[in-house]
């Protein structure tokens, strides 16, 4: 499972011009599900993201998590995060999970994040073409892969 996490002042996602999820200050999580991901990857990644101390404390140090700041989390599925560009110029998406595997893991990730936040995470629509709008804060952008745990 691979995620691009962006600290945002605000973010929203729309499908066919209709906003399906929006947050004020918090984290935008672009989430790619790999073909070999398991519920253990979901649990680890959700825990890691919710505990990341990338919000400033009273002294201006990155020392607070999205949970501690009562921020929002917007999760958007994005299989293209699993692209391989090793050969040629056309990306291969063979590492991405097929929709029948990816969708339940995406839903489980949303549930895990919501549980850790103590409120629902906002989301896009799995498999849909979406328009994502965001205002970066920092910018602070991290890439985390559950198969490369550090």
Swiss-Prot record:
A Gly-cisPro motif from one monomer fits into the active site of the other monomer to allow specific chiral rejection of L-amino acids. One of its GO terms (cellular component) is cytoplasm. Homodimer. GO terms for molecular function: D-tyrosyl-tRNA(Tyr) deacylase activity; Gly-tRNA(Ala) deacylase activity; Ser(Gly)-tRNA(Ala) hydrolase activity; tRNA binding. An aminoacyl-tRNA editing enzyme that deacylates mischarged D-aminoacyl-tRNAs. Also deacylates mischarged glycyl-tRNA(Ala), protecting cells against glycine mischarging by AlaRS. Acts via tRNA-based rather than protein-based catalysis; rejects L-amino acids rather than detecting D-amino acids in the active site. By recycling D-aminoacyl-tRNA to D-amino acids and free tRNA molecules, this enzyme counteracts the toxicity associated with the formation of D-aminoacyl-tRNA entities in vivo and helps enforce protein L-homochirality. Coiled coil: none annotated. The gene is dtd. It catalyses: glycyl-tRNA(Ala) + H2O = tRNA(Ala) + glycine + H(+); a D-aminoacyl-tRNA + H2O = a tRNA + a D-alpha-amino acid + H(+). Signal peptide: none annotated. One of its GO terms (biological process) is D-amino acid catabolic process. It is found in: Cytoplasm. This is D-aminoacyl-tRNA deacylase. It holds the Pfam family Tyr_Deacylase. Keywords: Cytoplasm, Hydrolase, RNA-binding, tRNA-binding. Its EC number is 3.1.1.96.
């Amino acid at each position: 499972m691979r995620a691009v996490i962006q600290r945002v002042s605000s973010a929203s996602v729309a499908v066919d011009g209709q906003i399906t999820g929006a947050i004020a200050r918090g984290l935008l999580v672009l989430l790619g599900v790999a073909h070999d991901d398991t519920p253990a990857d979901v649990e680890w990644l959700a825990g890691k993201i919710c505990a990341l101390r990338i919000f400033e404390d009273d002294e201006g140090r990155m020392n607070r998590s999205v949970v501690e700041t009562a921020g929002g989390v917007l999760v958007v599925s994005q299989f293209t995060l699993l692209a391989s560009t090793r050969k040629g110029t056309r990306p291969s998406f063979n590492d991405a999970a097929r929709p029948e595997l990816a969708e339940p893991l995406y839903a489980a990730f949303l549930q895990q994040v919501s549980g850790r936040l103590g409120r629902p995470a906002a989301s896009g629509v799995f498999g849909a073409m979406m328009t994502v709008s965001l205002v970066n804060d920092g910018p602070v952008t991290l890439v985390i892969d559950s198969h490369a745990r550090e």
